[in-house]
């Protein structure tokens, strides 16, 4: 047993210090990034925000809507090959280039992934996702997928420390997904005592990834546009959002009427609800590590994504960053004990 004395920080522990700016308007800020990925050699440009691979968030409808904003969707892994076929055949390259194909790590997942990728040359992104990215099994699976699909852009996770980021990149991942337990419907930290404050995880993992020519996705913990900006400021190349994009007409969650109001079911992918739906219940040897909540129906996701991007543009103007790429260079975090004045309630 050992104790690390360094304080680790989450988004609520800091604010970004304003700096002089020559920008006259938020409209001058460019949120598009261009990346050339280490192993695949592929180049992608767009707004590096990703809808999380949850079946009550990342539906095909979500992918179609977010592609209009140059935003990515990690489409959840529970669609059948037939459903993927219908989607791919009905969409343009402009949509498909903003889609990530999600996969588990079983032999069946590998076969299904290969069948889906074969449907279109525009499907370039793979999201390999397991809750515990510290498993050697994940590293072996990344090697297997890289060997079978050398042209694909592979993201893998989830992890929270630089050593594992480096191992996954060396094994063949272009991008590493960072975050254990910060999500709004995740209870891993409560059930297991395991986790890492998300901002510190992003800062440390970005440093490790960038040293090897890789990228990271900050996955989880964002509850407002300011948190998204802090994630980018901390060095995240991409930011993945679940709860912030849940509850919309494109999210795919079950719609329920409660007391005359439209509500949408949203749940973690290790929750009782998810395991009842996809695995026939919670196995006897494990515990559910997610919540199920009802969110007020929020209409179209277009308004929400515009609000998020508007907030990040505003962050850039406050620190003098003309582009999202410059934001991390212009970011100085200050530790705080307060975030906002809630005398009239929260935003």
Curated annotation (Swiss-Prot):
GO terms for cellular component: cytosol; GMP reductase complex. One of its GO terms (molecular function) is GMP reductase activity. K(+) binds at residues 181, 183. It catalyses: IMP + NH4(+) + NADP(+) = GMP + NADPH + 2 H(+). CDD domains: IMPDH (cd00381). Gene3D superfamilies: Aldolase class I. NADP(+) binds at residues 108-131, 216-239. Its EC number is 1.7.1.7. Keywords: Metal-binding, NADP, Oxidoreductase, Potassium. GO terms for biological process: purine nucleotide metabolic process. Pfam families: IMPDH. The active site is at 186 (thioimidate intermediate). The keyword Metal-binding applies. The keyword NADP applies. HAMAP family: GMP_reduct_type1. Catalyzes the irreversible NADPH-dependent deamination of GMP to IMP. It functions in the conversion of nucleobase, nucleoside and nucleotide derivatives of G to A nucleotides, and in maintaining the intracellular balance of A and G nucleotides. Homotetramer. This is GMP reductase. It comes from Shewanella halifaxensis (strain HAW-EB4). The gene is guaC.
């Amino acid at each position: 047993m050992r104790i690390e004395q360094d304080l680790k920080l989450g988004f609520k522990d800091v604010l970004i210090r304003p700096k002089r700016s020559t920008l006259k308007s938020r409209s001058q800020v460019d949120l598009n990034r261009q990346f050339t990925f280490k192993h695949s050699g592929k180049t992608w440009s767009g707004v590096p925000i990703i809808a999380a691979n949850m079946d009550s968030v990342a539906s095909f409808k979500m992918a179609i809507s977010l592609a209009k904003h140059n935003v990515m969707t990690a489409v959840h892994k529970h669609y059948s090959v037939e459903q993927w076929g219908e989607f791919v055949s009905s969409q343009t390259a402009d949509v498909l280039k903003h889609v990530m194909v999600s996969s588990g790590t079983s032999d069946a997942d590998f076969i299904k992934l290969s069948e889906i990728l074969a449907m279109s040359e525009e499907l370039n992104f793979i999201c390999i996702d397991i809750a515990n990215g510290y498993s050697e099994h994940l590293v072996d699976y990344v090697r297997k997928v890289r060997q079978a699909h050398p042209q694909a852009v592979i993201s893998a996770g989830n992890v929270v420390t630089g050593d594992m980021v480096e191992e996954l990149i060396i094994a063949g991942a272009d991008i590493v997904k960072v975050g254990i337990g910060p999500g709004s419907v995740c209870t891993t930290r409560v059930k297991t005592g395991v986790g890492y404050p998300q901002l510190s995880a992003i800062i440390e993992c970005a440093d490790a990834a960038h040293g090897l020519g890789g990228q990271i996705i900050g996955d989880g913990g964002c509850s407002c546009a300011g948190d998204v900006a802090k994630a980018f400021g901390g060095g995240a190349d991409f930011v993945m959002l679940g709860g912030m994009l849940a509850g919309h007409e494109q999210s795919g969650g079950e719609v329920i009427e409660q007391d005359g109001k439209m509500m949408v079911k949203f749940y973690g992918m290790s929750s009782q609800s998810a395991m009842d739906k996809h695995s026939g219940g919670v196995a006897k040897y494990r515990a559910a590590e997610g919540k199920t909540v009802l969110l007020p129906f929020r209409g179209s996701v277009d308004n929400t994504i515009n609000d998020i991007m508007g907030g990040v543009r505003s962050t850039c103007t406050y620190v003098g960053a003309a582009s999202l790429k410059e934001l991390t260079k212009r970011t100085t975090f200050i530790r705080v004990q307060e975030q906002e004045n809630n005398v009239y309630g929260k935003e």
